[in-house]
Amino acid sequence: MNNIVAIVGRPNVGKSTLFNRLIQRREAIVDSVSGVTRDRNYGKSEWNGKEFSVIDTGGYIRGSDDIFEGEIRKQVELAIDESDVIIFVVDVEEGITPMDDAVAKMLRKVTKPVLLAVNKVDNAMREKDAVEFYNLGLGEYYTFASISGSGTGDLLDALIDAFPIKPLPTQEEIVLPRFAVVGRPNAGKSSFINALIGKERFMVTDIAGTTRDSIDTKYDRFGFEFNLVDTAGIRRKAKVKEDLEFYSVMRSVRAIEHADVCILIIDATRGFEGQDQSIFWLAEKNRKGVVILVNKWDLVEKDTMSTRDYEAKIREELMPFVDVPILFVSALTKQRLLKALEATVQVYENRQQRISTSKFNEYMLKIIENHPPPALKGKFVKIKYCMQLPTPTPQFVFFANLPQYVKDAYKRFLENKIRENWDFEGVPIDIYIREK
């Protein structure tokens, strides 16, 4: 499982710029339809062959100029809880501020590695000014300039060295599929597992955030063994009262990255909200299987909303990845819970599916012949061979004479045709066009 790196610090010190540089992206991707900033605070990075996940703790905060120390404190607490290494960003131009002191005081108490990163150091004078940050009591510091990228190589070298050595998974952990039960606070995650197991495996109350730790439960249904995880990743501490997507998303990262299939539980009485969208996107981005369970359906007035209408509303928010099973359940009455588990097992099997190269070519090349990629600048794209790659998640490559002319719309067309002929429901798939 990847290490998780959290970037913390007060507003306007360059956290997001460093974040974007680490994941090699110029700007956040905003979904204008839903209003959700989908790719704002979480990304993947790699340095010297080591992959890791990066979280920008400021990524979901609006109006950051007005954030009080208390908000920053909550972000730092969250980073301490959920990350393996913390990067604390400060600004050499402003020097040490009272808020920097407050954050440093918290970080001095933790046992996890903390890298003090002094931003905007782009000349010899500022290198001298940076010496002041020794006074924060965090030891060695690393100078860099997030806009130009100067110094980030040394910071990344130190980051890789700071990663803890993690034990290799046991044979049973490798063999058994892992299903993560995810969702925003109080959607009914623990109740769902309790209903399946038939005993109070988890402490459940009406107060959001009562699941104290991630708990793996080995389970056997339909002769199929797997691990169920009710993640502490989607619980908030009592003192974190704000209903922000950020807290749910950050607490979801570890469980989702480690899962094969994510069971996303949403509260029928509240609808498919921002937190749900963010958690769904997180699972999709990590190429995990997804099953959506609409819990507490027994509490919804059926005269005002049918399952068909409700499902249609959810699928609108899932675009373009809509080939996902959606089931209406009640953990309280145990309505359709076994159906939900059967659907999860099916998604896992879909994710493991392998298509022979001969069958794949036989089916897809006929479709491509009848519906070839659009010509561009008078040049015609020809695809003569395709195959599924030997990867853990479904990935397909099509070999073309002019791969650069194949646009995303045609890739979606190919994906839809694959889904029409083979069952990949609940599973993200990747399409690559390569030069033959």
Swiss-Prot record:
Lineage, top ranks: Bacteria, Pseudomonadati, Bacteroidota, Flavobacteriia, Flavobacteriales
CDD domains: EngA1, EngA2
Keywords: GTP-binding, Nucleotide-binding, Repeat, Ribosome biogenesis
One Pfam short name: KH_dom-like
Residue ranges annotated for the KH-like domain, each copy included: 353-436
Ranges where the EngA-type G domain occurs: 3-167, 177-352
Protein role: GTPase that plays an essential role in the late steps of ribosome biogenesis.
Gene Ontology terms for molecular function: GTP binding; ribosome binding
Organism: Flavobacterium psychrophilum (strain ATCC 49511 / DSM 21280 / CIP 103535 / JIP02/86)
Residues involved in GTP 1 binding: 9-16, 56-60, 119-122
Stated name of the protein: GTPase Der
